[in-house]
Amino acid sequence: MVAALAKWCTDTDTRLTFFVNGVNTSWTDNAPALAPMVESGQVQLGNHTWSHPDITRIGLDAVADQIRRNGDFLRTTYGVDGTPYFRPPYGRHTADTDRVAADLGYTMVTLWSADIGDDRGINEAQLVANAQQTFQPQQIVLAHANLPPITHCLSQLSDIINSRGLRTVTLADVFS
């Protein structure tokens, strides 16, 4: 999935932010394709923990380890650590987990305002219908790089973006 999304970004000049779990080997396997886009700023990487646990159900030391380990992975693999952006798995976080993240440099807990639902095993038609509803101005749209349907309708997603006069941006484009 990461390979297809990287190719889409290359082919269409799409700008976006990926929140990475380093345990998924696709991020290592596709680093040669993604690294130039990360270096140029076309693609931004944020920290999404090493292995995607519900951080509200593990101890704070384990939360720190998850964030630190993933930051180390990002730094070693891509030359960036994802700071200041952290997206807690499942969107679940507490004031304590936010403090742990902030202590490690991740001061921007980043959630989303719209979700295309691609992580729930929907088919391509449902995904495109969801994109029709959620691709609106000034939205942070949640999508995933782990199930095939999204890779089969990237051109349709581009068409929705372009037909509405929207443009994709990274978080740094907006908040820097």
PLM feature spans:
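Active-site beta->alpha N-cap acidic-glycine motif
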Residues: 1-54, 60-62, 66, 71-76, ...
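Basic- and aromatic-lined ligand-binding clefts that recognize polyanionic substrates
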Residues: 76-92, 98-104, 148
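His/Asp/Glu-enriched short active-site or ligand-binding loop at hydrolase and phosphoryl-transfer sites
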Residues: 92-134, 166-176
